[in-house]
Amino acid sequence: MFINRWLFSTNHKDIGTLYLLFGAWAGMVGTALSLLIRAELGQPGTLLGDDQIYNVVVTAHAFVMIFFMVMPIMIGGFGNWLVPLMIGAPDMAFPRMNNMSFWLLPPSFLLLLASSMVEAGAGTGWTVYPPLAGNLAHAGASVDLTIFSLHLAGVSSILGAINFITTIINMKPPAMSQYQTPLFVWSVMITAVLLLLSLPVLAAGITMLLTDRNLNTTFFDPAGGGDPILYQHLFWFFGHPEVYILILPGFGMISHIVTYYSGKKEPFGYMGMVWAMMSIGFLGFIVWAHHMFTVGMDVDTRAYFTSATMIIAIPTGVKVFSWLATLHGGNIKWSPAMMWALGFIFLFTVGGLTGIVLANSSLDIVLHDTYYVVAHFHYVLSMGAVFAIMGGFVHWFPLFSGYTLNDTWAKIHFAIMFVGVNMTFFPQHFLGLSGMPRRSPDYPDAYTMWNTVSSMGSFISLTAVMLMVFIIWEALASKREVLTVDLTTTNLEWLNGCPPPYHTFEEPTYVNLK
């Protein structure tokens, strides 16, 4: 029974739960790696050993957080759980493929961990640029294992994307148009399209790298007429849509949370929100070379990528101001989920502003590969994606489990986390502006103060993570059942009770369109 339910599951709720548990576990691994990084940088001098091991930790931290924490939780966990419930579908379109998408991830994770256990590990950074990732600078199997890990994670995501697109287009009630689906459903569909279009390019790039390393091809080796810059173009054509893949489902969740706790029946500017997400998805594909301002492109190319990147700020601004307009005049309930959402809006905006700074090719020449870039993307990920995940988790926890969290503890957790992440990443802007380079385990004494502050902040965040584990334990141990849920008419996922029965919407859903 246990094996049939959890290994061979074809139920979107069980698979969603598996994704959430896997993502939480990977999140612990990723957090542990990040604390190793901050321990190393807490004071000048070396702690872990040589530069290679440090870079292996940095590389693994990135891969674990992106491919095994944020994506499985947001798309796999929340996506699987909520999309079928929100559109009144009995399950996903391809339930067995759904199970396969999940079970490709643990082997992928295993390959990534194996890559750091053999030879010297893959100390390439998550970008895996040749020639550093070639078979000369990285002899041995480490990079090859990392490439195979990425292949598996990529296949998993592509299959998941096909599944979500089919489900969302094909399994709505006949009377419901695409423009009547909730914003989270839209965000997952747009994310799935981005995955479907970008991952094959990554697969091509890393497969060419694999043959360069093992079969003596020269795709990225000038000695045989290749070009390492080609790899960068292929990687970033995936890598830039990827960062929007990481944040778009978060946008969807924040829209739901802000609307719900403002007591509104719909978000402000629904169509504007949809078009903004579609614009962000489209523009995400035509700005990739802003990661490459230092490789020597012509001034016209740089001018284009600078301008195109700045255009993304417009639909993003539409979203931020629509969230604020949703709050306006609402009957605001100060729940923990609302706090995460408000924290998201503020800190994501800060991260967006530093992004606008980095979009300027002339400034980026100076700031590229400094801690300013690290601070920028950690503001949008560590305080954007993670805050959205936390907000979504505390908001939908009663739906997933049938139990309520302790409100006071959840608010204390938010406060500690808020202080921790800001204390960790705000000083990194100063370090970057004074020229401290990324991916280096040691630094001149001049950078000591802000690094120490940053490392202290990381330990505050660790405290918050440990408190979160306690809060979840407390909720599951106390078993306070959910009494009522407000606004179920405009929040379809709550309609079947908390937790919903194993099978929902077994007969076609009746939709009364206003």
Swiss-Prot record:
Keywords linked to the UniProt accession: Calcium, Copper, Electron transport, Heme, Iron, Magnesium, Membrane, Metal-binding, Mitochondrion, Mitochondrion inner membrane, Respiratory chain, Sodium, Translocase, Transmembrane, Transmembrane helix, Transport
Membrane topology: Multi-pass membrane protein
Cross-link 1'-histidyl-3'-tyrosine (His-Tyr), where in sequence: 240-244
Mitochondrial intermembrane side: 41-50, 118-140, 213-227, 287-298, 358-370, 434-446
Residue positions binding Mg(2+): 368-369
Residues that bind O2: 244
Annotated residues for binding of heme a3: 376
The protein's name in its UniProt record: Cytochrome c oxidase subunit 1
Taxonomic lineage of the native organism: Eukaryota, Metazoa, Chordata, Craniata, Vertebrata
